[in-house]
């Protein structure tokens, strides 16, 4: 076992860690993807003084932003504030995060020569992330900290497309037309993802979540052939840390079984489910012993409290049916990230409701 796993915090009262490890929590655990973000006025006040990338590389800012939703909402887990492209910066990729657009890659990776020129992650480039984790482990008390990284496929899409994409056409075309370069690229990105998560795990995160945001653009056959082996290597490389690992993508109903299989080496496995798939149905698609996370539609939070309450109760009930159907546990979350226009008061009330059920 990795030496850091032996010194990790012992959090026996954590509902989140109980649920993902297959134990019965004393309350339904809840946290939100993108809980640290533009829905919070305190976050917007900080970001008015710092651009996104500067914020991601300032350990004290990362700590403060990560803590904000824990203080405000009483969520059962914190997730490290970062951006999916931070490890690419750690590997020397020239990029920027453009307001209203997202990550923009200065020189997209589209040829075998581009792939060959890619460099590995340099740990010293992402040292502020490790520093932030250490600050958070000290500040969070009994609340677990979830580490964060993008999966190789989603990172590949940003690199190939040059930024966010609706159809991922260049990505899929390269994957199919030049599989040798594709797999070489994915191997390099797998190493980058593993390295970035090792930095966080060595600093003390209690769990990790790997976001394959764009995997839903793929067929099951293409996912299995071109993506799953690389994602599986991420989780296998980190299994000796002994922490729970979550695998999440959007629009991945047909991929849930394969995404769950990729997690298999991990000691405790969780699959994130979006709002398109019932949790009880997802429980029949994933590997035995897998916990589920999700899956309230983020848009529901804009529809007024009566709608939110009804939908939240339905998700909790569905989570219980999922456990009855074989899921190891259920963590209440959204099916994707909190929308910027979400009223933070609704999120606070939602946490209180879920805890009461």
UniProtKB/Swiss-Prot annotation:
Its biological purpose: Catalyzes the decarboxylation of four acetate groups of uroporphyrinogen-III to yield coproporphyrinogen-III.
One cellular component (GO) term of this entry: cytosol
UniProt-annotated binding residues for substrate: 34-38, 83, 158, 213, 336
Annotated organism of origin: Mycobacterium avium (strain 104)
Pathway(s) served: Porphyrin-containing compound metabolism; protoporphyrin-IX biosynthesis; coproporphyrinogen-III from 5-aminolevulinate: step 4/4
Gene name per UniProt: hemE
EC number per UniProt: 4.1.1.37
Subcellular location(s) per record: Cytoplasm
Name assigned to this protein: Uroporphyrinogen decarboxylase
Keywords annotated in UniProt: Cytoplasm, Decarboxylase, Lyase, Porphyrin biosynthesis
Catalytic reaction equation(s): uroporphyrinogen III + 4 H(+) = coproporphyrinogen III + 4 CO2
Enzyme class: lyase
Gene Ontology terms describing biological process: protoporphyrinogen IX biosynthetic process
Site (Transition state stabilizer): 83
Assembly description: Homodimer.
Location (main, coarse): cytoplasm
Keyword Cytoplasm in record: yes
Similarity section: Belongs to the uroporphyrinogen decarboxylase family.
Keyword Transcription: no
GO-annotated molecular function: uroporphyrinogen decarboxylase activity
